[in-house]
Structures are given as structure tokens and as C-alpha cells.
A protein has these predicted regions:
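C-terminal alpha-helix plus adjacent terminal tail
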Residues: 2-25, 59, 72, 175-180, ...
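Short, glycine/charged-enriched secondary-structure capping and boundary segments
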Residues: 36, 44-45, 79-83, 128-131, ...
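Charged catalytic carboxylate motif
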Residues: 44-48, 98, 105, 201, ...
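Glycine- (often His-adjacent) and acidic-residue-rich active-site loop
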Residues: 69-105, 121, 267
């Protein structure tokens, strides 16, 4: 594969702490860079990703974006539960608002965004993944839509557009794991390739899109969103509002009790 550090055509250097950014010709590559915690989505990471996409939308040298995870274990294990647990109610509300904004930003971005799912993709990781235009995967890819296990709502607006309503219901109701072969057969991932070829193949597919006129791709994407269920954005924000109303007052300890007990983490005392 071409040198990921080339940054050919980038309009300006950008420095981040929790994501890495590279560019190959007209394809930008964003790596979620917290492998020590399976690329858990901290608020800082989410904001950095949102900032990068905002900048990329104004960059004529970028025709497509790829998002992947650092390391060989995970695309993303989901939200950073421990960070959320240690925040107060005001911080959690601000974090939830920021996550909602960035998720819709990814879904509606004027640039096509492809996910290269290099490992497990759980919880909030699946929310991010299903908000992208489409996904590439390997034999290491696996998915779990875990919101139901914590009494939460996620991906009700996005997953049905990828796999259809009956399959989406099964996966959202059960929270069971979906391995690579099944993910490919149900349409959750578009291409299933050997793990050693995943990034090469994803760059190849992205380059095939990026060579086209950016405004043409953006117009197609915008119209597809408009046509999906008539108003996909309304479906998205209905889920966000439903989350607020249905789970008002639910503490992190209550919502993620099994996870926190399994990890054996104690609350941080300040």
C-alpha cells in the first residue's frame, strides 16, 4: 500500500492526540488511536474526529474519507464508559449532545465516509459504523449492538437501511454478536477481504469514489438521505429525544452495572 504518511494534497497539517490522520492522493484516512482501550470513543476523540471531518469538507483535495481503528483487535469497543461514569450530570449531558451531533455529522457529511472495520465493533462503535456510507471488513470483523443490554437506544435509524427491518430488529433486540461472514451476507459490510488486505482494498474502493466530481457524490448522498424513509434525520433525532425521555435519571452504575462489575473498576475519588 502507498505510504500513509504522504499527506499528498492536504491543505494544512492537523495535530490530534486521539486520532491519526493521513492522506493518499484524494483519500483521507482517519485512525481511531486508542488501541490500549480498544479505541473506546472518548469525548476528546469524538470532538477530534468531528473537527477533522469539518475541515475535510472544505478541502478540495479530499474526495473520500476512511475511518479505521488502531491495532489489530478493534475498530472500536464503543463509548468510554469509565470516562462517562466519572463525569457529573452536566458533563454527561454535554457529552451526549456532542456525540449526537458528531454522529449525524458523519452520516450527512458532504464527503463519502467508509469504515474499514479491522476488528470488533461494539456498542457506540456500531453507532459510528452504521452512520457511515458503507463498511469494509475482514475475517476479524465482528459487531454487537449492545444498547439493549443496558436499556438504551441506538442505531434504530441507521441499521435498518443497511440490513433491512427484520434483520435489524433481530440484532437490536438481541444484542448478539454478528461475525464477519454473517455481516457480509446480510449487507452490514459491502466487501469481505483477508485482514492483511483490508486497508489496501478499502483505499482502492475509496479512490474509485474520490476520482469523481465531489459535488456529484455529495448530491447523490444528500438525495439518498432525503429519500430514505422520507426523512432520515427526523428518525435520528427522534431516537436521540427518545433516549433522553426514556432513560432520564438512569445512572452509569445502573445502566452499565454488569460491565463495570466485570471490569472490577472502582469509581475515581476526587
Amino acid at each position: 500500500m502507498a505510504n500513509l504518511g504522504s499527506n499528498q494534497g492536504a491543505t494544512k497539517p492537523m495535530t490530534f492526540e486521539q486520532i491519526k490522520t493521513d492522506q493518499i492522493d484524494r483519500v483521507a484516512i482517519v485512525t481511531l488511536n486508542r488501541p490500549e482501550v480498544l479505541n473506546a470513543l472518548s469525548l476528546q476523540l469524538v470532538r477530534e474526529l468531528d473537527e477533522f471531518v469539518t475541515d475535510a469538507e472544505q478541502d478540495d483535495s479530499i474526495g473520500a474519507i476512511i475511518i479505521t481503528g488502531a491495532g489489530d483487535r478493534a475498530f472500536s469497543a464503543g463509548a468510554d464508559i469509565h470516562e462517562n461514569r466519572e463525569n457529573n450530570d452536566e458533563q454527561r449531558a454535554a457529552g451526549a449532545a456532542a456525540r449526537a451531533d458528531y454522529t449525524w455529522h458523519l452520516a450527512a457529511s458532504t464527503k463519502p465516509i467508509i469504515g474499514a472495520v479491522n476488528g470488533l465493533c461494539y456498542g457506540g462503535g456500531t453507532v459510528m459504523a452504521t452512520s457511515l456510507d458503507f463498511l469494509m471488513g475482514s475475517e476479524k470483523s465482528s459487531f454487537r449492538f449492545l444498547a439493549v443490554n443496558y436499556g438504551q437506544l441506538n442505531a434504530t435509524w441507521s441499521l435498518p437501511t443497511m440490513v433491512g427491518w427484520p434483520k435489524a430488529k433481530e440484532l437490536l433486540y438481541s444484542g448478539r454478536e454478528v461475525f464477519a461472514d454473517e455481516a457480509y451476507h446480510i449487507g452490514l459490510i459491502n466487501h469481505l477481504v483477508p485482514s492483511g488486505e483490508l486497508m489496501d482494498r478499502t483505499v482502492e474502493v475509496a479512490a474509485g469514489i474520490a476520482k469523481n466530481r465531489s459535488e456529484g457524490v455529495a448530491n447523490i448522498k444528500s438525495l439518498l438521505i432525503e429519500h430514505t424513509g422520507n426523512d432520515l434525520e427526523t428518525q435520528f433525532w427522534t431516537e436521540i429525544e427518545g433516549r433522553k425521555e426514556r432513560f432520564k435519571g438512569l445512572s452509569v452504575e445502573d445502566g452499565f452495572k454488569d460491565f463495570l462489575n466485570r471490569k472490577g473498576r472502582k469509581p475515581r475519588v476526587s
